[in-house]
A protein has these predicted regions:
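Acidic-enriched and Gly/Ser
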Residues: 1-137, 163-194
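Short coil-to-beta-strand transition motifs
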Residues: 19-21, 141-149
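Short, conserved beta-turn/loop elements at beta-strand boundaries and strand-helix junctions
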Residues: 143-145, 155-160
Length: 194
């Protein structure tokens, strides 16, 4: 899998940030997140649809590498220019429904909106964060985990992962996100060999 914002989506993101937007979450069958996101992005020029993906560390036969995988299976974040009706956004190939709380139209607010804003800022991809050791403790210095430090509940220094707990739609989401060790050398940050 290789999800990333195209130049068209990057421009659309700038337009939405300038003009204002509403955010929603769609729910579909796991495995359809990429197909539906691509279809909606191609069919609606006022919309950004993105799954939430993460980079993960893997190792095979002593070789370390990173892979991209879906973090929230079945969920798609959708951002529409203010004033657009989410109910007019349709898929011709796949089923999805708009998640909503009781008595609302699905438009995100509060902590759910903050989370969706963070997903948009990350462009749907949680890259590998960077960390240093300070007195034997892990300190995140760059990347998506930097903004989630209050949500980190566990570190695996050996596997270079942090377990986070966040809440979306009142449900606790538990996930492991990767980091790489870096050295602080005379003020410059340099990547260590993997």
């Amino acid at each position: 899998m290789n999800w990333s914002f195209s130049s068209k989506l990057l421009q659309r993101k700038q337009d939405l940030l300038t003009s204002g937007y509403d955010a929603y979450v769609l729910f579909t069958l796991q495995g359809l997140e990429l197909d539906i996101s691509e279809e909606l992005n191609n069919n609606y020029d006022y919309c950004i649809a993105t799954p939430l993906t993460k980079m993960s560390h893997r190792s095979r036969s002593g070789n370390k590498y990173d892979v991209q995988e879906i973090l929230l299976g079945g969920y798609i974040f959708v951002y529409l220019r203010k004033g657009r009706d989410i109910n007019k956004v349709k898929s011709t190939k796949n089923y999805f429904r708009i998640l909503s709380r009781q008595n609302d139209d699905g438009r995100l607010c509060g902590k759910d909106l903050e989370y969706a804003d963070w997903v948009l800022e990350q462009e749907g991809v949680l890259s590998v964060s960077e960390a240093i050791k300070i007195n034997g403790m892990v300190k995140i210095v760059n990347g998506p985990l930097k903004n989630l430090e209050g949500s980190i509940v566990e570190y695996s220094k050996r596997n270079r992962n942090c377990r986070i707990e966040v809440e979306l739609f009142g449900q606790k989401i538990d996930a492991w996100l990767p980091f790489d060790w870096i050295d602080a050398d005379m003020g410059d940050l340099k990547m260590q060999q993997r």
